[in-house]
């Protein structure tokens, strides 16, 4: 059976929960493109079954930050997904601050191992 991976392209294109904006870029647009690219890469491997939170760049989930997140989690849980990957592009005005973040629900799990190898 294929591993089910739910990719959440964080934030909405308008309305609630739109994310950061700067230098002509909108976080939700970058997240959408990265999510589609990642989904395409994973779909090329038959070991993975992939779903996205937003199937179009104009899709809006929820009516507030809380309901937007709840909608994404509900979609993943109702599938049910084995892994939930939420893509975000954080920023800071200080160019010396950079890096990536990975959060997992529990240590000593397959998800924890995967997070350490991303």
Question: Which functions belong to the PLM regions below?
Answer:
Residues 2-113:
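Catalytic-core regions of hydrolytic enzymes
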